[in-house]
């Protein structure tokens, strides 16, 4: 049996370490033992985050919605309530404050971990507006590891304050 983390502060620290590793250039990082409540669905309590690209991972979420949404999806991973699961697809959906995180069971030999593979923001799509006197220099939005770091540190700091206020 892997390490289980039941304390909110310890869960937060494990996720901060994983996200910091990704911001610093690692392609994927696992926050071990943060969701022991997922074990009955076939995996461990480990959740793996991947940087990804335009089609998957944290980059995909940030590229589509920005760093604040990435932070809120990560918050759903940390403290979200299980709202549904699919035995066929081997997925579990967690919900927190209007954000959903979809975790898929990922098998690496005998290692079973949950991989953040989807998300949902319960808000309609909206086009961004820009007020500038010059033409855009990029044809599409950009998102970087430093954007991830700035956005998620803000969200994780807010969550840390909540945890500290409740202890």
How would you describe each model-predicted region?
Residues 1-167:
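Ribonuclease/tRNase effector modules and their secretory precursors
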């Amino acid at each position: 049996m892997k390490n289980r983390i039941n304390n909110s502060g310890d869960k937060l620290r494990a996720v901060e370490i994983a996200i910091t590793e990704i911001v610093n250039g690692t392609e994927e990082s696992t926050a071990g033992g943060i969701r022991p409540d997922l074990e009955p669905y076939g995996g461990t309590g480990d959740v793996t985050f991947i940087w990804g690209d335009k089609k998957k991972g944290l980059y995909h979420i940030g590229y589509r919605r920005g760093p604040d949404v990435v932070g809120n999806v990560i918050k759903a991973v940390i403290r979200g309530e299980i709202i549904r699961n699919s035995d066929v697809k081997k997925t579990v959906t967690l919900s927190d404050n209007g954000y959903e995180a979809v975790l898929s069971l990922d098998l690496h030999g005998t290692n079973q971990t949950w991989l953040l593979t989807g998300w949902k923001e319960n808000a309609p799509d909206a086009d961004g507006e820009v007020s500038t006197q010059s033409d855009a220099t990029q044809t599409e939005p950009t998102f970087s590891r430093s954007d991830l770091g700035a956005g998620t540190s803000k969200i994780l700091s807010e969550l840390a304050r909540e945890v500290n206020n409740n202890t």
